Amino acid sequence: MTTAQILEKMIVFSEGNLHDIDHLIRVWTYAKTIGELEGLDSRTQYILETAAITHDIACPYCRTKYGNTEGRHQEEEGAWIVRDFLRGTGMDEAAAGRVIYLVSHHHTVTGVDGADYQILLEADYIANAEENHWPEENARRFLSSVAGTESGKRLIREILLPGQEEADRTRAGQVCESGS
């Protein structure tokens, strides 16, 4: 299946939940953009985009089973749900295994073992921060402790910390001027 076909399948799977659909499209768009800017090879890009589209596939099930969509529940339940979802897509076993791994780790910021994993974390963070209006301090913390790609860092700065670099340069200039 093409990425567009997987996206369509996931939209159908989402059963009209506009919040979930909007979020997966945001994450996919950011992941696609960062992956392309970082120059991922086509196979890794496809795996990344598929993982971005399906990363929250367990949310409907978690809402029913647990009454919430906490990250740990998404990671636990997401593996088997995305495995079933990927059947019949024509994705080879190794690629499907990687997508399953990414979906079942997309809230774990330690042990990042590839550009696809790193970019998925960054894309999901940007989308969540936008949707939930997280404070700038959270973005600065993520930027310094989790963000790893140059493209992801640029997008975080531009989207979540607009004007921050200019303000930092201005403050630095004022400090230099007053310190002379």
Locations of the language-model features?
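Active-site flanking loop/helix segments enriched in acidic
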Residues: 2-26, 58-69
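Divalent metal-dependent phosphate-bond-processing catalytic cores, especially two-metal-ion Mg2+/Mn2+ enzymes
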Residues: 12-41, 54, 91, 107-180
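Conserved acidic
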Residues: 19, 44, 70, 74
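An active-site-proximal "capping" alpha-helix that borders the catalytic cofactor pocket
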Residues: 27-30, 72-88
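Membrane-helix interface segments
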Residues: 42-44, 95
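His-Asp-centered metal-binding catalytic motifs of divalent-metal-dependent phosphohydrolases/nucleases
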Residues: 45-67, 78, 82, 100-107, ...
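Active-site-proximal substrate-binding core of FAD-dependent oxidoreductases
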Residues: 93-100, 112
